[in-house]
């Protein structure tokens, strides 16, 4: 579900605990992304793809979904772009 920024900003201004939770979540996401970038820069193609799938698994699990079975909603091209790999490499 999408909440327009102006509405979320207004609500978080009125509810300090909501603002704190949003900041906590954003900080966690930024930290996770930074760690992924560092890891990916040191990995070969196979390791990058494995780390990507593992990261998705952990995120699904944290949200109460199955960590073992989930649908990849990104295309091979999108995954390749995210990981800095070609579509052919992702397809292998």
From Swiss-Prot:
Alphabetical keyword list: 4Fe-4S, Activator, Cytoplasm, DNA-binding, Iron, Iron-sulfur, Metal-binding, Transcription, Transcription regulation
Any one biological process term the GO annotation gives: regulation of DNA-templated transcription
Annotated SUPFAM superfamilies: Winged helix' DNA-binding domain (SSF46785)
Organism: Aggregatibacter aphrophilus
Subcellular localization: Cytoplasm
Cofactor note: Binds 1 [4Fe-4S] cluster per subunit.
Chief place where the protein resides: cytoplasm
UniProt: [4Fe-4S] cluster binding residues: 1
InterPro entries according to UniProt: HTH_CRP (IPR012318), RmlC-like_jellyroll (IPR014710), WH_DNA-bd_sf (IPR036390)
GO cellular component: cytoplasm
Superkingdom per UniProt: Bacteria
Keyword Transcription regulation: yes
Molecular function per GO: 4 iron, 4 sulfur cluster binding; DNA binding; metal ion binding
Subunit (UniProt): Homodimer.
Role according to the record: It is involved in the activation of genes necessary for anaerobic respiration.
Protein name: Anaerobic regulatory protein
UniProt domain HTH crp-type: residue ranges: 43-92
Up-regulation conditions: By anaerobiosis.
Cofactors: [4Fe-4S] cluster
